[in-house]
């Protein structure tokens, strides 16, 4: 009798396991296409990474038959004198849209404030907001507002292409063209989004240390390695095979914020004049230009790429950038640059406390595109 009951229980569990396996396989089949597109495509593209980064055939397919001669677009607003006869540590370009006045105002009061950097950090930076023209539907009124804004602040450069996501590479070309023409002596160049936060005291201290050793061939940020082109036509990042035929991009840094040395800026500008700029994903185009001249990006754990950093003094101590800050920009600037932040990790117990807090905040199982877990141990 016991054997009969035991046999029934075994069959019952076998049935449950079979049902579970069937449901699992059915779910896997249903979701396989998006899983395959996301995971498998990354695995495939990463396997091509060495070839893409090491050989010239990628750039050969994108090279122009005739080198571009000068800018294709004219300046509507410009400040040729911005860098003249000055020792510039950092030329900072902020990618912005014509309508984003509030974002520009917040940056002027915080990390983009030249006077603050000069008086408090003993460094000379030049901040410029890079943009195109307003959408035609928004008319001349917004352009008049931009002209008024620039008369007040003298920190906008604008060319006569329409400002849109699909013209981001044109905006990048404008930045490198301006730097090459009007500020070739800047020690470093940085490009950043207008919803980014930059811990300027930490960044300036870092760049000054690099300047002292005469660093060259320098490009740093959050590095994307072996990233595949998006072939999904519903994505705004869609890239056709006609535009880019290879299974992986060269290594590049996230466009949210990255820094290059002045010599790299000059080389990238020259390379940009020889490549087809129809690829509108600007950070990828930057990677193609750098790949052409043999510059390899370096990953910095405190450049957050597209992610927003956790709010905590132990994080602020070494942070460089954090993405996605609008309403909280002023408060974050005040808290992160408070001199007391530098004292929180002093002493044995302070170091232990901050190490534990960073492990708790950064070493999570769920994927968050912010600082990696290894940043907790630096």
UniProtKB/Swiss-Prot annotation:
Organism name: Homo sapiens (Human)
Q: Where in the cell is it found?
A: Golgi apparatus membrane
Which pathway, metabolic or otherwise, does it act in?
Protein modification; protein glycosylation
**How is this protein positioned relative to the membrane?**
Single-pass type II membrane protein
- What induces or represses expression of this protein, per its UniProt record? Up-regulated by stimulation with retinoic acid and down-regulated with 12-O-tetradecanoylphorbol-13-acetate (TPA).
Record-level Gene Ontology MF annotations = glycosyltransferase activity; lactosylceramide 1,3-N-acetyl-beta-D-glucosaminyltransferase activity; N-acetyl-beta-D-glucosaminide beta-(1,3)-galactosyltransferase activity
Give glycosylation sites per the record: 59
Q: Which InterPro entries match?
A: Glyco_trans_31
Q: What is this protein called?
A: Lactosylceramide 1,3-N-acetyl-beta-D-glucosaminyltransferase
């Amino acid at each position: 009798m016991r054997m009969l009951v035991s046999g029934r229980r075994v069959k019952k569990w076998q049935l449950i396991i079979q049902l579970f396996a069937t449901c699992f396989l059915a779910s896997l089949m249903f979701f396989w296409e998006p899983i395959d597109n996301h995971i498998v495509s990354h695995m495939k593209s990463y396997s091509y990474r060495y070839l893409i980064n090491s050989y010239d055939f990628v750039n050969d397919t994108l090279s122009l038959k005739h080198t571009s001669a000068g800018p294709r677009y004219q300046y509507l607003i410009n400040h040729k004198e911005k860098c003249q006869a000055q020792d510039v540590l950092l030329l900072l370009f902020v990618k912005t849209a014509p309508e984003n006045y509030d974002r520009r105002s917040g940056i002027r009061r915080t990390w983009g404030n030249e006077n603050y950097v000069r008086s408090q950090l003993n460094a000379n930076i030049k901040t410029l907001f890079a943009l195109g023209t307003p959408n035609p539907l928004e008319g001349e009124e917004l352009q008049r507002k931009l002209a008024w804004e620039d008369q007040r602040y003298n920190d906008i450069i604008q060319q006569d292409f329409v400002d849109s996501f699909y013209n981001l590479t044109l905006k990048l070309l404008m930045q490198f063209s301006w730097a090459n023409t009007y500020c070739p002596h800047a020690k470093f160049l940085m490009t950043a989004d207008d919803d980014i936060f930059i811990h300027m005291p930490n960044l300036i201290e870092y760049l000054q240390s690099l300047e002292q050793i005469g660093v060259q061939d320098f490009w740093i940020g959050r590095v994307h390695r072996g990233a595949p082109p998006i072939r999904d036509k519903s994505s705004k990042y869609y890239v056709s095979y006609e535009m880019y035929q290879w299974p992986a991009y060269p290594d590049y840094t996230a466009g949210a914020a990255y820094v290059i040395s002045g010599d790299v800026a000059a080389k990238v500008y020259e390379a940009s004049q020889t490549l087809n700029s129809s690829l509108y994903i600007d950070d990828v185009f930057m990677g193609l230009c750098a790949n052409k001249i043999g510059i390899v990006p370096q990953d910095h754990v405190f450049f957050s790429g597209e992610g927003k950093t956790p709010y905590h003094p132990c994080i602020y101590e070494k942070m460089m950038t954090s993405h996605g800050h609008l309403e909280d920009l002023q408060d974050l600037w005040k808290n992160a640059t408070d001199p007391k932040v530098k004292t929180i990790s002093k002493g044995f117990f302070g170091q232990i406390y901050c190490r534990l807090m960073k492990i708790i905040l950064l070493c999570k199982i769920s994927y968050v595109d912010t600082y990696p877990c290894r940043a907790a141990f630096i």
